[in-house]
Amino acid sequence: VTTTNLYRGTTLSGLFLILLATQAIGQGVRIPTAFEQTAISNEKNLIAAKKKDDGAFFKRTLAEDFSLVGIDGQLVQGEEAAGSLGDPDLAELAPYDMKVVALGDNGAVVTYDAVVREAPQEDQGPPPRYQHFSSVWVKLDGQWKLKFHQATATHWGDW
């Protein structure tokens, strides 16, 4: 093996690895569309409002027929649902892996996983630490409204 052949083989191998890495990186990054960015922004605003129990945000953002399925699996609607959305004891709600499914131009389903940390209540333990959330957003009269929200435990007992 000559030095030239060794150099040529090393160079070709290096170029091949760079090409593979470039393609892998390019395929893994997907820029969200403007529609998806709007839906994700709406959901992040909801998360911030949940942490602060921001009644003004809920009043302005929830659809009139808003309904909620809580971590206990119970369906609540109307004022009861709006009152169940905020949680001032929520120490952490860290979303990850957000996905958006468009429902035409005027609707979206936003789903994501989240790490949840909350102070335990006296009569019960803390909620499941890992949860999956789903929200249905609809555009009514030019404004995005939250029509439905659901929390589902993904791991019980992981504190």
Write out the residue ranges for each language-model feature.
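Bacterial N-terminal signal peptides that target proteins for export
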Residues: T2-G14
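A beta-strand edge to alpha-helix "cap/lid" segment located at domain peripheries
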Residues: Q27-W159
